[in-house]
Amino acid sequence: RARPPRPAPAGAPAAELTGLSADRGARTVLAGVDLTVRTGEVLALVGSNGAGKSTLLGAVGGDVPCTGDVVIDGAPLRSWSHTELAMRRAILLQRQTLAFPFTVAQVVAMGRSPWAGTPLMDDDEAAIGEAMRETGVTGFTDRPYPHLSGGEQARVALARVLAQRTGLLLLDEPTAALDLRHQEMVFGVVRRRAAAGAAVVAVVHDLGLAAAHADRVAVLAGGRLAACGPPDEVLTAPLLTEVYRHDIEVFPHPRTARPVILPHRPSGPPEP
């Protein structure tokens, strides 16, 4: 019988990585990463293309082969069955593919599958409804998923993850296909889930979103952890310029004092 998770106190480790390494063929993608993610926080993973962000997220979720130690909910990753792991972590993949024309409601309901046959299956209707409201998809629940726009599909996929109601959310570029309003909506949902006790790890390409919404930022470079800490300590012009190999400027926001991050651009009008 699958062992359900127990409630964790605020600040408890939700995932602990020690010496995490991964290869793809002859190329080292992750090299000795040590990282702890705690309940109640939003941790943003940033870095240039190929830095190892998605691989790290997949390794934490148990979907990418790796060496080193991964501990989820106080026990080694390999000690959990597939169902037990699905009760503890939910993964939003970078790309969502469905071979059949499931409706939006059916896709979101898939997030409840780990709880089938447990007392928590009584929460299915509430969890599905809450997730669809949070992501703004209640207006098209009967539409086939393949017929949706890219942004709509992204929000439905996130709703499925939220409906799973796990203590650890692993989100790979949750805002990549979204406009500005829906980006802010998604991170509002993420912040509320963290405030309610979840641990959230999100791969984010938009450094401004990471600076504005993350409690901590982990910067990956060449498969290694270059820095990890609060946004105002980690997202500095020298480090980002080195990591992205492009001149970066960082300013404090006049109202929030959070870092505002921009690529350095020549002054004056753009050249024709």
Regions found by a protein language model. Give the residues of each.
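Conserved ABC transporter NBD signature motif
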Residues: 66-76, 85
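Conserved ABC ATPase "signature" region
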Residues: 122-140
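Helix-to-loop junction immediately C-terminal to a conserved catalytic motif
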Residues: 61
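Catalytic Walker B motif of ABC-type/P-loop ATPase nucleotide-binding domains
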Residues: 169-173
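Conserved ABC ATPase signature
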Residues: 144-148, 152
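The feature captures the beta-strand-to-loop junction immediately N-terminal to the Walker
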Residues: 46-48
